Amino acid sequence: MTQGGPLSYSCGLAGPALLGRTIDEVLSESATRFPQGEALVVCHQGVRLTYAEFQSRVSQTAKGLMAVGVRKGDRVGIWAFNCEEWVLTQFATAAIGAILVNINPAYGTRELAYALKQSGTHTLLFQSHFKHSNYPAMLEEICPEIAQCRQGRLRSRNLPHLRKLVFLGEGKKHDWLVWQDLNGLAQSISDESLAARQAELTFEDAINIQYTSGTTGFPKGVVLTHHNLVNNALFIGNSMNLSNRDRICIPVPFYHCFGRT
């Protein structure tokens, strides 16, 4: 637009109104309205959780992350294919104001190192493998200090922000934390401490970094907020006329935009 020229404007519908709420607030409302309704089914793990059970597991995971030192604004990476732990971590990080970093399970060491460093990931949750990729061996390649890791604590020259490792598999090679450790550590965080953290949150807070496909260069981190994700879900639900009687099957990967949003 040239100086002094006509103004441009966009005219469209003003409704429905956007929701100014956090993901945790939306989950809490759903658990109150439909406590015995099924919230999550993970067939390959034999998991079936009601909304009440799911909210309880999310709170436990949130407390576990707080116990290992995850603060508001910290980046928590998850390097795994679709599983119960992925979904719990997604909602738990949102509940404590952390930012979930989605990491493509198919990444090689080069892409992994880039994503962890570029995002400033503080805590990484990871599985044992994906197809022919050995995740622990790949981490050792980009972060040799893993061999000296004690109780999940890490100091890395190549990844200066990375402080905690949580293994989602079995037969861990080093002194990493495992998923069950988070559940145990959660007992050290009171309900009041979790509520105080949640009271700090606003719907404009960033809660997710998704990486683009990187077809023209390195993947770029896209930041999403509570506002983005809650209202995206609202409009999808409205356009599909979804209700509490419907079930949604998500076969696509959680790490990218379709599965995550």
Model feature map: region roles:
Residues 1-49, 53-68, 72, 112, ...:
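N-lobe entry segment of adenylate-forming
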Residues 19, 39-91, 108-113, 178-187, ...:
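Conserved AMP-binding/adenylate-forming core of the ANL superfamily
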Residues 35-38, 158-162, 166-167, 173, ...:
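Conserved pre-ATP/AMP-binding loop-to-beta segment of ANL
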Residues 48-52, 198-231:
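Conserved AMP-binding A3 loop
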Residues 62-63, 74-75, 81-101, 105-109, ...:
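A short helix-loop-beta submotif of the ANL/AMP-binding
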Residues 67-70, 238-242:
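Glycine-rich helix-loop-beta junction characteristic of Rossmann-like nucleotide cofactor-binding loops
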Residues 68, 96-184:
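Structural core segment of the AMP-binding/adenylate-forming
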Residues 78, 239-261:
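Conserved AMP-binding loop of ANL adenylate-forming enzymes
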